Protein backbone atom coordinates (compact mmCIF):
# COMPACT_ATOMS: atom_id res chain seq x y z
CA UNK A 1 0.00 0.00 0.00
CA UNK A 2 2.75 2.45 0.97
CA UNK A 3 4.62 1.63 -2.23
CA UNK A 4 1.55 2.71 -4.23
CA UNK A 5 1.11 5.96 -2.31
CA UNK A 6 3.16 8.05 -4.80
CA UNK A 7 0.91 6.74 -7.57
CA UNK A 8 -2.18 7.82 -5.63
CA UNK A 9 -0.67 11.28 -5.16
CA UNK A 10 -0.14 11.52 -8.92
CA UNK A 11 -3.69 10.30 -9.55
CA UNK A 12 -5.13 13.19 -7.52
CA UNK A 13 -2.59 15.67 -8.99
CA UNK A 14 -0.87 16.58 -5.75
CA UNK A 15 2.17 17.21 -7.92
CA UNK A 16 0.18 19.74 -9.98
CA UNK A 17 -1.52 22.26 -7.64
CA UNK A 18 -2.68 24.61 -10.42
CA UNK A 19 -6.14 23.01 -10.54
CA UNK A 20 -6.65 23.47 -6.80
CA UNK A 21 -5.67 27.12 -7.04
CA UNK A 22 -8.13 27.73 -9.87
CA UNK A 23 -10.88 26.42 -7.58
CA UNK A 24 -9.56 28.24 -4.54
CA UNK A 25 -9.38 31.84 -5.81
CA UNK A 26 -13.11 32.28 -6.61
CA UNK A 27 -14.02 30.54 -3.34
CA UNK A 28 -11.80 32.95 -1.40
CA UNK A 29 -13.32 35.88 -3.30
CA UNK A 30 -16.75 34.76 -2.15
CA UNK A 31 -15.68 34.18 1.46
CA UNK A 32 -14.11 37.64 1.70
CA UNK A 33 -17.05 39.43 0.10
CA UNK A 34 -19.69 37.47 2.04
CA UNK A 35 -17.96 38.24 5.36
CA UNK A 36 -17.00 41.85 4.55
CA UNK A 37 -13.34 40.88 4.56
CA UNK A 38 -13.36 39.06 7.90
CA UNK A 39 -13.96 35.33 7.33
CA UNK A 40 -13.77 33.22 10.47
CA UNK A 41 -10.57 31.18 10.52
CA UNK A 42 -12.30 27.81 11.12
CA UNK A 43 -14.59 28.50 8.16
CA UNK A 44 -11.63 29.49 6.00
CA UNK A 45 -9.83 26.27 6.94
CA UNK A 46 -12.91 24.18 6.08
CA UNK A 47 -13.26 25.73 2.64
CA UNK A 48 -9.56 25.60 1.79
CA UNK A 49 -9.21 21.96 2.81
CA UNK A 50 -12.55 21.04 1.24
CA UNK A 51 -11.50 22.65 -2.03
CA UNK A 52 -8.26 20.66 -2.09
CA UNK A 53 -10.02 17.39 -1.29
CA UNK A 54 -12.83 17.83 -3.82
CA UNK A 55 -10.43 18.82 -6.56
CA UNK A 56 -8.44 15.67 -5.82
CA UNK A 57 -11.61 13.56 -5.85
CA UNK A 58 -12.57 15.14 -9.17
CA UNK A 59 -9.19 14.26 -10.68
CA UNK A 60 -9.60 10.62 -9.66
CA UNK A 61 -13.10 10.47 -11.16
CA UNK A 62 -11.95 12.26 -14.30
CA UNK A 63 -9.17 9.72 -14.85
CA UNK A 64 -11.64 6.88 -14.28
CA UNK A 65 -14.11 8.31 -16.79
CA UNK A 66 -11.41 9.08 -19.39
CA UNK A 67 -9.24 5.99 -18.91
CA UNK A 68 -10.04 4.64 -22.39
CA UNK A 69 -9.37 8.01 -24.03
CA UNK A 70 -6.30 9.19 -22.13
CA UNK A 71 -4.04 6.46 -23.49
CA UNK A 72 -4.42 8.05 -26.94
CA UNK A 73 -3.43 11.54 -25.74
CA UNK A 74 0.28 12.40 -25.53
CA UNK A 75 -0.06 14.48 -22.37
CA UNK A 76 -2.09 11.91 -20.41
CA UNK A 77 -0.81 8.53 -21.65
CA UNK A 78 1.47 8.06 -18.64
CA UNK A 79 -1.09 8.83 -15.91
CA UNK A 80 -1.19 6.06 -13.25
CA UNK A 81 -4.62 4.72 -14.20
CA UNK A 82 -4.15 5.05 -17.95
CA UNK A 83 -0.80 3.27 -17.88
CA UNK A 84 -2.20 0.42 -15.77
CA UNK A 85 -0.13 1.16 -12.67
CA UNK A 86 -3.30 1.36 -10.57
CA UNK A 87 -6.71 -0.23 -11.13
CA UNK A 88 -10.00 1.45 -11.98
CA UNK A 89 -11.61 0.45 -8.68
CA UNK A 90 -8.78 2.11 -6.77
CA UNK A 91 -9.46 5.44 -8.50
CA UNK A 92 -13.17 5.22 -7.69
CA UNK A 93 -12.46 4.25 -4.08
CA UNK A 94 -10.08 7.18 -3.63
CA UNK A 95 -12.64 9.59 -5.11
CA UNK A 96 -15.37 8.29 -2.77
CA UNK A 97 -13.15 8.50 0.32
CA UNK A 98 -12.03 12.06 -0.47
CA UNK A 99 -15.61 13.19 -1.17
CA UNK A 100 -16.75 11.61 2.10
CA UNK A 101 -14.04 13.41 4.07
CA UNK A 102 -15.09 16.66 2.40
CA UNK A 103 -18.68 16.05 3.46
CA UNK A 104 -17.56 15.41 7.05
CA UNK A 105 -15.70 18.72 7.02
CA UNK A 106 -18.88 20.74 6.45
CA UNK A 107 -20.91 19.06 9.20
CA UNK A 108 -20.41 22.02 11.59
CA UNK A 109 -21.95 24.35 8.97
CA UNK A 110 -25.60 25.25 8.43
CA UNK A 111 -28.22 23.20 6.60
CA UNK A 112 -28.22 25.33 3.46
CA UNK A 113 -24.49 24.79 2.96
CA UNK A 114 -24.92 21.03 3.37
CA UNK A 115 -27.76 21.00 0.83
CA UNK A 116 -25.65 22.93 -1.67
CA UNK A 117 -22.79 20.49 -1.11
CA UNK A 118 -24.98 17.69 -2.47
CA UNK A 119 -25.52 19.68 -5.67
CA UNK A 120 -21.80 20.44 -5.83
CA UNK A 121 -20.98 16.74 -5.47
CA UNK A 122 -23.36 15.81 -8.30
CA UNK A 123 -21.92 18.45 -10.63
CA UNK A 124 -18.32 17.50 -9.83
CA UNK A 125 -19.04 13.80 -10.28
CA UNK A 126 -20.90 14.20 -13.56
CA UNK A 127 -18.50 16.65 -15.22
CA UNK A 128 -16.07 14.01 -16.57
CA UNK A 129 -18.92 12.52 -18.62
CA UNK A 130 -20.04 15.83 -20.14
CA UNK A 131 -17.24 15.66 -22.71
CA UNK A 132 -19.17 12.91 -24.47
CA UNK A 133 -22.36 14.93 -24.97
CA UNK A 134 -21.82 18.66 -24.40
CA UNK A 135 -20.17 20.84 -27.05
CA UNK A 136 -18.64 23.16 -24.44
CA UNK A 137 -18.03 21.00 -21.36
CA UNK A 138 -15.79 23.76 -20.00
CA UNK A 139 -18.94 25.71 -19.09
CA UNK A 140 -20.09 22.80 -16.94
CA UNK A 141 -16.61 22.73 -15.43
CA UNK A 142 -17.10 26.38 -14.49
CA UNK A 143 -20.14 25.42 -12.43
CA UNK A 144 -18.23 22.58 -10.76
CA UNK A 145 -15.16 24.74 -10.09
CA UNK A 146 -17.27 27.67 -8.92
CA UNK A 147 -19.83 26.03 -6.66
CA UNK A 148 -17.76 27.01 -3.67
CA UNK A 149 -19.06 30.54 -4.32
CA UNK A 150 -22.73 29.98 -3.37
CA UNK A 151 -21.60 27.59 -0.64
CA UNK A 152 -19.37 30.30 0.87
CA UNK A 153 -22.22 32.81 0.94
CA UNK A 154 -24.53 30.18 2.42
CA UNK A 155 -22.00 29.34 5.14
CA UNK A 156 -21.47 32.99 6.10
CA UNK A 157 -24.91 34.53 5.54
CA UNK A 158 -27.25 31.50 5.57
CA UNK A 159 -28.58 32.69 2.22
CA UNK A 160 -27.37 32.87 -1.36
CA UNK A 161 -27.88 36.40 -2.73
CA UNK A 162 -27.96 37.34 -6.40
CA UNK A 163 -24.36 38.53 -6.09
CA UNK A 164 -23.22 34.94 -5.49
CA UNK A 165 -24.89 33.71 -8.67
CA UNK A 166 -23.40 36.59 -10.66
CA UNK A 167 -19.97 35.63 -9.33
CA UNK A 168 -20.65 32.04 -10.38
CA UNK A 169 -21.48 33.23 -13.90
CA UNK A 170 -18.18 35.12 -13.96
CA UNK A 171 -16.43 31.92 -12.94
CA UNK A 172 -18.10 30.01 -15.78
CA UNK A 173 -16.71 32.49 -18.30
CA UNK A 174 -13.27 32.33 -16.68
CA UNK A 175 -13.31 28.52 -16.72
CA UNK A 176 -14.24 28.46 -20.40
CA UNK A 177 -11.33 30.83 -21.08
CA UNK A 178 -8.61 28.93 -19.25
CA UNK A 179 -9.83 25.43 -20.02
CA UNK A 180 -10.13 26.28 -23.71
CA UNK A 181 -6.44 27.20 -23.56
CA UNK A 182 -5.87 23.80 -21.96
CA UNK A 183 -7.96 22.09 -24.65
CA UNK A 184 -5.97 23.82 -27.38
CA UNK A 185 -2.98 21.78 -26.21
CA UNK A 186 -4.79 18.50 -26.91
CA UNK A 187 -6.72 19.60 -30.00
CA UNK A 188 -5.17 17.10 -32.44
CA UNK A 189 -5.58 14.17 -30.05
CA UNK A 190 -9.17 15.12 -29.18
CA UNK A 191 -10.13 15.18 -32.85
CA UNK A 192 -8.83 11.62 -33.27
CA UNK A 193 -10.63 10.16 -30.25
CA UNK A 194 -13.88 12.10 -30.61
CA UNK A 195 -13.85 14.05 -27.33
CA UNK A 196 -15.90 17.26 -27.34
CA UNK A 197 -14.10 20.40 -26.18
CA UNK A 198 -14.62 24.13 -26.48
CA UNK A 199 -11.41 24.40 -28.54
CA UNK A 200 -12.97 22.18 -31.20
CA UNK A 201 -16.40 23.79 -30.94
CA UNK A 202 -15.01 27.31 -31.35
CA UNK A 203 -12.76 26.15 -34.20
CA UNK A 204 -10.86 28.98 -35.87
CA UNK A 205 -12.54 31.45 -33.50
CA UNK A 206 -10.99 29.81 -30.43
CA UNK A 207 -8.62 32.66 -29.59
CA UNK A 208 -11.38 35.24 -30.01
CA UNK A 209 -13.70 33.15 -27.83
CA UNK A 210 -11.09 32.92 -25.08
CA UNK A 211 -10.58 36.68 -25.06
CA UNK A 212 -14.33 37.34 -25.09
CA UNK A 213 -14.69 35.05 -22.07
CA UNK A 214 -11.94 36.96 -20.27
CA UNK A 215 -13.74 40.20 -21.16
CA UNK A 216 -17.02 38.85 -19.78
CA UNK A 217 -15.34 37.69 -16.56
CA UNK A 218 -13.58 40.97 -15.93
CA UNK A 219 -16.62 42.94 -17.04
CA UNK A 220 -18.70 41.21 -14.37
CA UNK A 221 -16.04 42.07 -11.82
CA UNK A 222 -16.38 45.71 -12.86
CA UNK A 223 -20.06 45.46 -11.96
CA UNK A 224 -19.15 43.77 -8.66
CA UNK A 225 -16.62 46.46 -7.81
CA UNK A 226 -19.01 49.30 -8.62
CA UNK A 227 -21.96 47.68 -6.84
CA UNK A 228 -19.97 47.05 -3.66
CA UNK A 229 -18.19 50.40 -3.78
CA UNK A 230 -14.70 48.94 -3.85
CA UNK A 231 -11.76 51.31 -3.66
CA UNK A 232 -8.47 51.84 -5.45
CA UNK A 233 -6.81 48.68 -4.10
CA UNK A 234 -9.46 46.52 -5.74
CA UNK A 235 -9.17 48.32 -9.06
CA UNK A 236 -5.39 47.86 -8.99
CA UNK A 237 -5.95 44.11 -8.64
CA UNK A 238 -8.55 44.20 -11.40
CA UNK A 239 -6.15 46.08 -13.71
CA UNK A 240 -3.45 43.49 -13.01
CA UNK A 241 -5.94 40.76 -13.96
CA UNK A 242 -6.61 42.57 -17.24
CA UNK A 243 -2.87 42.63 -17.83
CA UNK A 244 -2.72 38.87 -17.26
CA UNK A 245 -5.51 38.29 -19.79
CA UNK A 246 -3.73 40.41 -22.39
CA UNK A 247 -0.52 38.48 -21.74
CA UNK A 248 -2.41 35.25 -22.35
CA UNK A 249 -3.39 36.53 -25.78
CA UNK A 250 0.28 36.82 -26.72
CA UNK A 251 0.74 33.18 -25.68
CA UNK A 252 -2.27 31.63 -27.44
CA UNK A 253 -2.53 33.69 -30.62
CA UNK A 254 -0.34 31.26 -32.60
CA UNK A 255 -2.07 28.19 -31.11
CA UNK A 256 1.18 26.43 -30.24
CA UNK A 257 0.97 23.66 -27.63
CA UNK A 258 3.42 24.79 -24.97
CA UNK A 259 2.53 28.51 -25.01
CA UNK A 260 -1.17 27.56 -24.73
CA UNK A 261 -0.35 25.36 -21.74
CA UNK A 262 1.67 28.20 -20.22
CA UNK A 263 -1.33 30.51 -20.63
CA UNK A 264 -3.54 27.99 -18.84
CA UNK A 265 -1.11 27.74 -15.92
CA UNK A 266 -0.72 31.52 -15.74
CA UNK A 267 -4.41 31.85 -14.85
CA UNK A 268 -3.32 31.20 -11.29
CA UNK A 269 -1.86 34.72 -11.35
CA UNK A 270 -5.02 36.21 -12.83
CA UNK A 271 -7.13 34.68 -10.07
CA UNK A 272 -4.55 35.57 -7.45
CA UNK A 273 -4.28 39.27 -8.25
CA UNK A 274 -8.06 39.60 -8.41
CA UNK A 275 -8.36 38.09 -4.94
CA UNK A 276 -5.48 40.24 -3.70
CA UNK A 277 -7.40 43.31 -4.84
CA UNK A 278 -10.50 42.21 -2.95
CA UNK A 279 -8.56 41.33 0.21
CA UNK A 280 -6.55 44.57 0.05
CA UNK A 281 -9.72 46.63 -0.26
CA UNK A 282 -11.19 45.16 2.92
CA UNK A 283 -7.88 45.37 4.76
CA UNK A 284 -7.46 49.05 3.93
CA UNK A 285 -11.12 49.78 4.64
CA UNK A 286 -10.75 48.16 8.06
CA UNK A 287 -7.59 50.13 8.78
CA UNK A 288 -9.27 53.38 7.76
CA UNK A 289 -12.22 52.53 9.98
CA UNK A 290 -9.91 52.23 12.95
Curated annotation (Swiss-Prot):
Where does the protein principally reside?
Answer: membrane
Primary enzyme class: transferase
Biological process terms in GO annotation: ubiquinone biosynthetic process
- Which cofactors are required for activity? Mg(2+)
Keyword Thylakoid in record: no
Tell me where it resides: Cell inner membrane
Which InterPro entries does the UniProt record give?
A: HB_polyprenyltransferase-like (IPR006370), Prenyltransferase (IPR039653), UbiA_prenyltransferase (IPR000537), UbiA_prenylTrfase_CS (IPR030470), UbiA_sf (IPR044878)
Identify the pathway. Cofactor biosynthesis; ubiquinone biosynthesis
Q: Tell me the Gene3D superfamilies matching this sequence.
A: UbiA prenyltransferase
GO CC entries: plasma membrane
Q: Mind listing the UniProt keywords for this protein, alphabetically? A: Cell inner membrane, Cell membrane, Magnesium, Membrane, Transferase, Transmembrane, Transmembrane helix, Ubiquinone biosynthesis
What catalytic activity does the UniProt entry give for this protein?
all-trans-octaprenyl diphosphate + 4-hydroxybenzoate = 4-hydroxy-3-(all-trans-octaprenyl)benzoate + diphosphate
GO MF term set: 4-hydroxybenzoate polyprenyltransferase activity
EC number(s) of the enzyme?
A: 2.5.1.39
Note the topology in the membrane.
Multi-pass membrane protein
User: Where does the chain cross the membrane?
Assistant: 41-61, 89-109, 133-153, 158-178, 202-224, 269-289
Functionally, this protein is described as follows: Catalyzes the prenylation of para-hydroxybenzoate (PHB) with an all-trans polyprenyl group. Mediates the second step in the final reaction sequence of ubiquinone-8 (UQ-8) biosynthesis, which is the condensation of the polyisoprenoid side chain with PHB, generating the first membrane-bound Q intermediate 3-octaprenyl-4-hydroxybenzoate.
Record's family?
Belongs to the UbiA prenyltransferase family.
What HAMAP family is this protein classified in? UbiA (MF_01635)
Q: What is this protein called?
A: 4-hydroxybenzoate octaprenyltransferase
Originating gene:
ubiA
Amino acid sequence: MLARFPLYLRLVRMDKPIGSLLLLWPTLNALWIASDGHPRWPLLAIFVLGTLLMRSAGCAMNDYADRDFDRHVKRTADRPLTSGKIRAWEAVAIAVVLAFISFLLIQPLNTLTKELSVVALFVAGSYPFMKRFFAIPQAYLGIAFGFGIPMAFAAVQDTVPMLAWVMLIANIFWSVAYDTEYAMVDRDDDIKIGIRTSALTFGRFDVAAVMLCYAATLGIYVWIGVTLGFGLAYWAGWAAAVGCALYHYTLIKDRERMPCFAAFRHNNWLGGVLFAGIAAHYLLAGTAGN
